[in-house]
Amino acid sequence: MCRHKNLGNSTMISNDFECEDQLNMHRATPCHRYLLALPLKPSHRGLLLVVGCNPSTADANADDPTLVKLRTWATFNGYSHLAVVNMFSYRETSPRKMKAAGTMTFLEGGGEVDVWIERAASIASDIVLAMGDIAFKSWGNFRNPFHSTTESGKNRRIRARSRLVEIVDLIRREKQKESKIFAFCLTKAAFPGHILYLPNSLKSRDNWLDVTEHNFDTG
């Protein structure tokens, strides 16, 4: 079980309130990552929280393509810090190994995952949902390793959307009143799009979709 500092009263990150102090930087175990928090440049806009699907091997010292793009877009829009949490904490980049772990492992959330989502949402200036079509045949150009598991596609879609709704409800309860919830875009299946496959024309915050009040129950 990860240990963390007590945040006390919810306080938005600002120039003089370091993200490291509030979130105690990244939290990882060999198989799970619950939160990755990175300082960017001093700015008035504060912390951008991004909710992905599941964590890669990236950490505070090593980027991956998704983290590089998130960092670039967050800096472009004037955020002072970037924090990344995920719907699921299972940490793996190999489709073969992810498939071996099983759909149940992948689609299980809650617990420690939700604790870190709550903590980050309570101090974020803005939140972006960016998990992609997690229950469908592919993620962008990559085959979804869970598409051919024994669980039916319909059942996976129901559970995946249920987890999305669960997280959105959690964020709405915990976020600052003035904070907005965005998606870079919505896919055809009405899931928030994954940043890795999106054009730079969506880089500006002005082009993000405000989904603060969006109903994800029905897609």
Question: What function would you assign to each model-found segment?
Answer:
Residues L35-P42, A62-L82, V115-I123:
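Short amphipathic alpha-helices and their capping/turn segments at secondary-structure boundaries
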Residues S80-M98:
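Short connector loops at secondary-structure junctions
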